[in-house]
Amino acid sequence: MAVRYELAIGLNKGHKTSKIRNVKYTGDKKVKGLRGSRLKNIQTRHTKFMRDLVREVVGHAPYEKRTMELLKVSKDKRALKFLKRRLGTHIRAKRKREELSNILTQLRKAQTHAK
């Protein structure tokens, strides 16, 4: 990447910039890290912990409770349609349905171990 100069025209127009270097040192090796913009949708340990803590304290939203009821009676397609209307996109709805079905399976496992 060429050094840019504060010119109004040409290939190097724009503000003076330098390449972002994000290098992590692990022991004796240099490992190239990820840029901040590439960390989108990657969950860190801290964010996972905080979200789990909030979920434990606050509980589920009403639409999530209704979806879990639909999943309990094996209405997966209806749950997907419901979530799609609430969340906006098909992919978000599928991800949420998967998340809620995993929560239901964990609850079932916890109930069987409690008996």
UniProtKB/Swiss-Prot annotation:
Broad class of where this protein is predominantly found: cytoplasm
Which Gene Ontology terms describe the biological processes this protein takes part in?
A: cytoplasmic translation
Q: Which organism does this record belong to?
A: Drosophila melanogaster (Fruit fly)
Q: Mind telling me what this protein is named?
A: Large ribosomal subunit protein eL36
Q: Which family does it belong to?
A: Belongs to the eukaryotic ribosomal protein eL36 family.
Q: Which domain of life is it from?
A: Eukaryota
Spell out the subcellular localization from the entry.
Answer: Cytoplasm, Cytosol; Cytoplasm
Keyword Translocase among record annotations: no
